[in-house]
Amino acid sequence: MSGRIEYIAGPVVKADLPGAKLYELVFVGEIKLFGEVVRVQGDKAFIQVYEDTTGLRPGEPVVRSGEPLSAWLGPTIIGKIYDGVQRPLKNIEEISKSPFIARGIGYDQAPPLDLKAEFDFKPAVKPGEEVSPGDVLGSVKETELMTHYILYPPLPENAPGVVEWVADGKYKVDDVIARIKTKRGIVEVKMWHKWPVRRPRPFREKLPPVEPLITGVRTIDTMFPIAKGGAAAVPGPFGSGKTVTIRTLSMFAQSRFIIPVLCGERGNEAADALHGLLKLKDPTTGRSLLERTTIIVNTSNMPVAAREASVYMGTTLGEYFRDQGYDVLVLADSTSRWAEAMREVALRIGEMPSEEGYPAYLPTRLAEFYERAGRVVLIGSKERVGSLTIAASVSPPGGDFTEPVTSNTLRFIGAFWPLSPRLAYSRHYPAIDWLAAFSRYVDTVEVWWSKNISTEWRRIRDTLQSLLVKEAELQEIVRILGTEALSEYEKHVLNVAFMIREGFLKQDAFNPVDTPSSPIKQFLLMKAIYAYYEEGMKAIEAGVPAAVLRELETVKRLPRLRMEVTNDVAKEELTKFIESLVSEIRSVLAARKQ
């Protein structure tokens, strides 16, 4: 089960390791650094090391673990901050006695779960009841916001059977809480189990994503929605607002459980994001957001190989909570850093480079990641539904969206929210470019909006989007010939598009009135702008100049509404405003006819 190092090249080690398996977890050197076998040639194994290899030398031992890199899944996950291989950073700090992570800290010193923690276990099954892998055996109240359901692990060795023993009471995480009698023998179930991070957890069938994931961000929810179980990408250059967008989603997205994965970002930026997340409160209960969050941190100065582990680790944790029947959101920031790590390791082990040096399997790895999102019927004897939504930022060098990571990501996602430096530098946030963004979920979530908010939602949304496209065309004419060359109708279109941009798309992420924006507030803000457009068209046809309409008091108030009307009074206040807006435009029209 052991071998010797032959050579070291940065994060990659070649070892003589008979019997090594692909993606097996190994411990490298005298200090037992975490590593993963990424290539096997005969008895030779190429290992990507998840810790700094400085000081390693040929001849040191490499010890096989006999199992793949796996996530530890069970109570005490919630609220933890992990590194890329699921070691709690708080424990590492206590052991290292330094701001920097000491090498060779194993799971024995920093276990991912507190196996000695005690919880009140409440069984959901009785002795004699038939159960299948994936069934809920009981639950523990881990935090005020989250009930942690204990599953009969869907491991390959577990088979359907009959509950032989289960009882309520106080148990440690490592205690046996049930015994299942199967054809293969007795299975003793503990509160926790391991799952290989590269293996997707099983489900019965995938369902169409029909319910929108409400994020409180108007540009996303209304114009380019994402459904629960969908996948989205947020590409953008430096300074365009990717991290703030991800932070806003982590705070206000209506998911029961959220997993931010800070993958390869700058250390000070990650620290700032962490401090922000730790201070955030759940908007519905006022309790700490950490009570329904697990954070994975892997900064740019940490070993590059661990970036890959952190992405898979976050997705596996997300699938685990999905299997409990929750709606889960995984936020990866950013997949470009993961791809760069993949490129470095691939080149170190001598694989043939593809476009821009990335390995030929880059699209495959991206597909494996994004395809783990989905709204699914869970396995087990009772039908339950859970969802895993993935939103990942992409950091293309120089904002070039044609580079391999961004262009390949486009193939596997349903919503694309590109951030524009032009909008960011003009202080328009979120800086999502409405001319380049798209969503494949508009048709599927339309039913939800029609049923819960208004049947007019799709028609008004499509009209506003077409006006933004029309504005871009008219701006070309204005740049060349000036506004004098435009008709009154075209001037009105420009005025309405300005209202859409300033009064709807623009949103202050740090203003409690403006963010989050409830679905009804979003719709009525949109309807108010649509009313200005529709009634204004009738007035212009009767000869009223667009400039006169623009100077009306209610129209002047349109861009400020988002900052003045709170979610709890939005329905009453905005309905009254729309009535007064229509009334004022019609009075101008009536005066014109006289």
From Swiss-Prot:
In which compartments does the protein localize?
Answer: Cell membrane
One function term, GO molecular function aspect: ATP binding
Stored InterPro entries: ATP-synt_VA_C, ATP-synth_a_Xtn, ATP_synth_asu-like_sf, ATPase_F1/V1/A1_a/bsu_N, ATPase_F1/V1/A1_a/bsu_N_sf, ATPase_F1/V1/A1_a/bsu_nucl-bd, ATPase_F1/V1_b/a_C, P-loop_NTPase
Q: How does it sit in the membrane?
A: Peripheral membrane protein
- Give residues annotated as binding ATP: 236-243
What superkingdom does the record give? Archaea
Instruction: Provide the catalytic activity annotation.
Output: ATP + H2O + 4 H(+)(in) = ADP + phosphate + 5 H(+)(out)
Q: Which UniProt keywords apply?
A: ATP synthesis, ATP-binding, Cell membrane, Hydrogen ion transport, Ion transport, Membrane, Nucleotide-binding, Translocase, Transport
Q: Under the cellular component aspect of Gene Ontology, which terms does the record hold?
A: plasma membrane
What EC number(s) has UniProt assigned to this enzyme?
7.1.2.2
- Leading EC class: translocase
Question: Quick one: a GO biological-process term for this protein?
Answer: proton motive force-driven plasma membrane ATP synthesis
Record HAMAP family? ATP_synth_A_arch
* Function comment: Component of the A-type ATP synthase that produces ATP from ADP in the presence of a proton gradient across the membrane. The A chain is the catalytic subunit.
Q: Which family does it belong to?
A: Belongs to the ATPase alpha/beta chains family.
Assembly, in brief, is: Has multiple subunits with at least A(3), B(3), C, D, E, F, H, I and proteolipid K(x).
Cross-referenced NCBIfam families: PRK04192.1 (NF003220)
| Protein known as | A-type ATP synthase subunit A
Gene designation per UniProt: atpA
